[in-house]
Amino acid sequence: MRLLLLLLVAASAMVRSEASANLGGVPSKRLKMQYATGPLLKFQICVSUGYRRVFEEYMRVISQRYPDIRIEGENYLPQPIYRHIASFLSVFKLVLIGLIIVGKDPFAFFGMQAPSIWQWGQENKVYACMMVFFLSNMIENQCMSTGAFEITLNDVPVWSKLESGHLPSMQQLVQILDNEMKLNVHMDSIPHHRS
């Protein structure tokens, strides 16, 4: 029982330190283009969906074409309920794997008879631990995936994958940026009259 308690405390401490360093899959540092002084182009992406490479490619092309634009990228967080479910599952997964390895029957603690799947897990510990690990990870990833690829220029939305349903092509993004930059230059050239 002490070993189980120690395992639970260690798992909880590990999850807390991981959560403070990496909140819900958010990279601990933002992806930024330093030294640029112009407008801010901000990408909010679903890192767990594999959009990081797309962002890096877009960032490379945009920084070559528009050297004055500052580019930032960050993880688009899912709703808090999904983040909490994923955090709970990560702790529960470790506790369950610990119980399987140690061989303690948690159902006896509640005065219940162990189900047949628990007995199977005790007879096949390696397979049971792998199954718990992979199924839990699959559900955690599903909870943390948003599918987002949101782009803003100076906090004005210019593209939303959540609304459009697809990623912008490089040509679309360059055309949007060209139009926005021309509009900004045009607006800056209009004299402001005071009343």
From Swiss-Prot:
Gene Ontology terms describing biological process: cell redox homeostasis; cellular oxidant detoxification; glucose homeostasis; insulin secretion involved in cellular response to glucose stimulus; pancreas development; positive regulation of cytosolic calcium ion concentration; positive regulation of growth hormone secretion; response to glucose
Superkingdom, taxonomy of origin: Eukaryota
Instruction: State whether keyword Transmembrane helix applies.
Output: yes
Segments passing through the bilayer: 85-103
Which positions are linked by Cysteinyl-selenocysteine (Cys-Sec)? C46-U49
Task: Return one GO MF term.
Answer: thioredoxin-disulfide reductase (NADPH) activity
Induction entry? Induced by Parkinson disease-inducing neurotoxins such as 1-methyl-4-phenyl-1,2,3,6-tetrahydropyridine (MPTP).
EC numbers listed for it are: 1.8.1.9
Intracellular or extracellular location(s): Endoplasmic reticulum membrane
Give the matching InterPro entries.
Selenoprotein_Rdx-typ (IPR011893), Selenoprotein_T (IPR019389), Thioredoxin-like_sf (IPR036249)
Its catalytic activity? [thioredoxin]-dithiol + NADP(+) = [thioredoxin]-disulfide + NADPH + H(+)
Cellular component GO terms held in the UniProt record: endoplasmic reticulum; endoplasmic reticulum membrane
Ordered alphabetically, the record's keywords are: Endoplasmic reticulum, Membrane, NADP, Oxidoreductase, Redox-active center, Selenocysteine, Signal, Transmembrane, Transmembrane helix
What's noted about post-translational modification? May contain a selenide-sulfide bond between Cys-46 and Sec-49. This bond is speculated to serve as redox-active pair.
Looking up PANTHER family in the UniProt record yields: SELENOPROTEIN T (PTHR13544), THIOREDOXIN REDUCTASE-LIKE SELENOPROTEIN T (PTHR13544:SF0)
Could you tell me what this protein does? Selenoprotein with thioredoxin reductase-like oxidoreductase activity. Protects dopaminergic neurons against oxidative stress and cell death. Involved in ADCYAP1/PACAP-induced calcium mobilization and neuroendocrine secretion. Plays a role in fibroblast anchorage and redox regulation. In gastric smooth muscle, modulates the contraction processes through the regulation of calcium release and MYLK activation. In pancreatic islets, involved in the control of glucose homeostasis, contributes to prolonged ADCYAP1/PACAP-induced insulin secretion.
Family indicated by similarity? Belongs to the SelWTH family. Selenoprotein T subfamily.
Q: What is this protein called?
A: Thioredoxin reductase-like selenoprotein T
**Record gene name:** SELENOT
